[in-house]
């Protein structure tokens, strides 16, 4: 894009009546970031740090953003974060916009964002060829083939999936790229859906607390986790 990408975006012809067709578009989301900057005088990083990242435990100084030619952070993708960062964000949605007792997102917004607002990818010729791209789209969040399941979906298979009926989240960071486009990440989703079908029905009963097992799991997770690398210039 050029330095005048905002003007070019606004001058792009609209081929369909608004609300009648879905075409994957990242510039539209980046334009929302430009609106935030216009209204607040802050870029996305500086705006979100005290309002979101700090509140849900994301180390904002460790994030890396791709930028537009005018220096604004890309709003439609290009933020490099850890798997745990992604999980924290979608945990906020899974809990209805509340984090440790503090409301961060409105309940109404979360309900709309995580439910079908349009028939996604209505033109298959210009959308990634993956079955889970044709289930529906909320506000920056994709619906999934298993009923009630939704996901955040980044480039090359960065998925954070919410299973509301099971009170469960699953975050994946991978590099599923190739000439087949969306078909590569779709294989990961297909595998997850097969695994989901093999699970017993979710129970509505609360299991008794098992302190010993919980402590064992915490110790195990500490050994599995990798320390977040500090942000630094790219190596040669």
Residues of each region from the PLM?
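Catalytic-site signature segments of enzymes, centered on catalytic residues
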Residues: 1-77
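Active-site Gly/Thr loop motif
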Residues: 3, 60-63, 111-171
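Non-transmembrane alpha-helical segments in soluble domains
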Residues: 6, 10, 33-37, 45-49, ...
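Active-site rim elements
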Residues: 18-22, 73-78, 149-156, 176-183
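Active-site-proximal alpha-helical segments within enzyme catalytic domains
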Residues: 28-35, 75-98, 110, 158-175
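Active-site-proximal binding-pocket segments
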Residues: 53-115
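Short, gly/Ser/Thr-rich active-site loops of penicillin-recognizing serine hydrolases
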Residues: 180-236
